[in-house]
Amino acid sequence: MLIYSIVLMLVVTLIIASITLLERKLLSLVQRRVGPNFVGYKGRLQYLADALKLFLKGVAIPSGANSFFFVAMPSLAGAVCYTFWMNSIWGPSLSMFDVEYNIVYASLLSILFGLCVMLTGYFSKNKYSVMAGLRAAILMLNLEIFLGIVFLNVCFLVESFSFAAFAVYQEIFWLIFLFFFLLSNILLVFLLEVNRTPFDLAEAESELVTGYTTEYGGFYFALFYLGEYFHLFFFSCLISVVFFGSWELLKPFLFLHNYTV
């Protein structure tokens, strides 16, 4: 179980790092600029250089901040993000544990991450961080209500909150054909949830103050930075599980469960 946990964390971290590089490449293409092109072949190892810089950078704790909670909040947020992937979203066997109420479990973890964001701004003792933390937390919690109502309707149709039930229900007919217009609204809400353009309300690229992470740097800033991309990747997987046939398309790769604990 310990080995599987370590492998899972490494695989997810590498996927998230690749997503960060892909997003930067796409943004540079849209904005007609070069983008990352120095480290590795055409900049493909840029995420390794960024990670090395962040992990070797020192951490300064503000004099008025609570040192314990200042360090604990990003650590808790990082733990919440990794806990997402211990659920059975990979497949029936490729998970550390399986719970009957997978959708509820994911929603609770998402709400907990929003609380971490709010408390992060509060314990920084910076008025800009406090305002940004409240703004981000209120936005995330309000969106969770909408997502909860939407997924509740879908779960009533499937008569279960389990990812396995969604896989069985969609063996013949995908739910995307029933909830196409609803999915378009969900995608807009997900953009709001993960603070992606044009809904980057909690933190805009044009602002000098980086929201609730204003006082953070180095390793602790990297945890929040990865947390946003964890949400982005997890919500993408969640949409695939709920609307696009679950893990039925991954059946050729399910032989890997023989090599897991």
Curated annotation (Swiss-Prot):
One of its GO terms (molecular function) is NADH dehydrogenase (ubiquinone) activity. Keywords: Electron transport, Membrane, Mitochondrion, Mitochondrion inner membrane, NAD, Respiratory chain, Translocase, Transmembrane, Transmembrane helix, Transport, Ubiquinone. It is a multi-pass membrane protein. GO terms for cellular component: mitochondrial inner membrane. Its EC number is 7.1.1.2. It catalyses: a ubiquinone + NADH + 5 H(+)(in) = a ubiquinol + NAD(+) + 4 H(+)(out). It comes from the Eukaryota. The chain crosses the membrane at residues 2-22, 69-89, 103-123, 138-158, 172-192, 224-244. It is found in: Mitochondrion inner membrane. Belongs to the complex I subunit 1 family. This is NADH-ubiquinone oxidoreductase chain 1. It comes from Paramecium tetraurelia. The gene is ND1.
